[in-house]
Amino acid sequence: MTKMRESEIIRMFIEEFDNHALGDDAGFVRFNDSWLLVTSDMLVWRTDVPDFMTPEEAGKKVVTMNVSDIAAMGGLPLAFFFSLGVPENTDEKTLRGIAKGINKGAKEYGVKIVSGDTNEAREIIIDGGAIGRGSRLLLRSNAKPGDLVCVTGELGRPLTALLLWLKGEEIPPKILEKAKNPKAREREGIELSNYANSAIDISDGLSKELWEIARSSNVRIVIDEDKIPVNEEVREIVKDPIKIALASGEEFELVFTIPKENLGNISFDFTIIGRVEEGEGVYIKREDKMERLPILGWEHLKGGDYVNL
């Protein structure tokens, strides 16, 4: 059994590859006067699909996961492809539901399903991929001192839904809807490509994503606890809503850093939660105290758990 975390495995592979530029939400190669973006993201039934989610919702989620990666790079999603691992005892209803969900997601985001593969597996695995195009890329490594740190949407619902489900408690409809049917911010990503310096999607938790930007850009990020956009229902349900908002993964909201003078050009709703400074690390301001922010969020291969939660 491996003793390495998911993030450690990723870093190890990047070290072995000649292309050390890997590490963003999507890979990219120059294609004429634009960038060709390619990403892949996998959904494994045992770890990624709680029983409150239908096969159709799971199929659509795989498309969302991959489109979100393209959006975080500031790209226009164009195509979706996937490989499907299927146990031999899987019923047709489940497979048909997955197929309908993939098609529904492709229609919603305006991407074409261009390729697929199927093989036998011990459990259902959907390994999705997306192709996109961008003119100006949003990289995790391009945050600049003086940038403001912003986030789209409200945070906390997916993790709240998961924790309630694990405890066997009823999940309020609006909390459940975000967990079952997340949305990629593809339009926002395209707009941000003109004005922001860096971006990342919240797939593993706000805390982890902020650390990714800080490390990749060699900067210090300071956020204000009072400015984190926690969903109101989450505040009413959980004991520590800020911690939940910082750790909640599969939000697929965008975190971005942007020069202050460019804020007026943004047409969608967002929340300013902090700033980028010279230095290193991620810090959170709580009342009059400044604390180093722990890395909270989902981590595969350590029991599949939310680390430090």
From Swiss-Prot:
Annotated positions binding Mg(2+) 1: S40, D41, D117
GO biological process, any: thiamine diphosphate biosynthetic process
Reactions accelerated catalytically: thiamine phosphate + ATP = thiamine diphosphate + ADP
Entry binding sites for Mg(2+) 4: D25, T39, D69
Sites where the protein binds Mg(2+) 3: D25, D69, D201
UniProt-annotated binding residues for ATP: G116, D117, R140, S203
Residues annotated to bind Mg(2+) 5: D204
E.C. numbers: 2.7.4.16
GO molecular function: ATP binding; magnesium ion binding; thiamine-phosphate kinase activity
Residues annotated to bind substrate: D48, E250, W298
Biological pathway: Cofactor biosynthesis; thiamine diphosphate biosynthesis; thiamine diphosphate from thiamine phosphate: step 1/1
Claim: Transferase is one of the keywords in the record: yes
Residues annotated for Mg(2+) 2 binding in this entry: D41, D69
UniProt xrefs under Pfam families: AIRS, AIRS_C
Keyword annotations of the record: ATP-binding, Kinase, Magnesium, Metal-binding, Nucleotide-binding, Thiamine biosynthesis, Transferase
Free-text function comment from the UniProt entry: Catalyzes the ATP-dependent phosphorylation of thiamine-monophosphate (TMP) to form thiamine-pyrophosphate (TPP), the active form of vitamin B1.
Miscellaneous section: Reaction mechanism of ThiL seems to utilize a direct, inline transfer of the gamma-phosphate of ATP to TMP rather than a phosphorylated enzyme intermediate.
Family the entry assigns: Belongs to the thiamine-monophosphate kinase family.
Stated name of the protein: Thiamine-monophosphate kinase
Species this chain originates from: Pyrococcus horikoshii (strain ATCC 700860 / DSM 12428 / JCM 9974 / NBRC 100139 / OT-3)
Organismal lineage: Archaea, Methanobacteriati, Methanobacteriota, Thermococci, Thermococcales
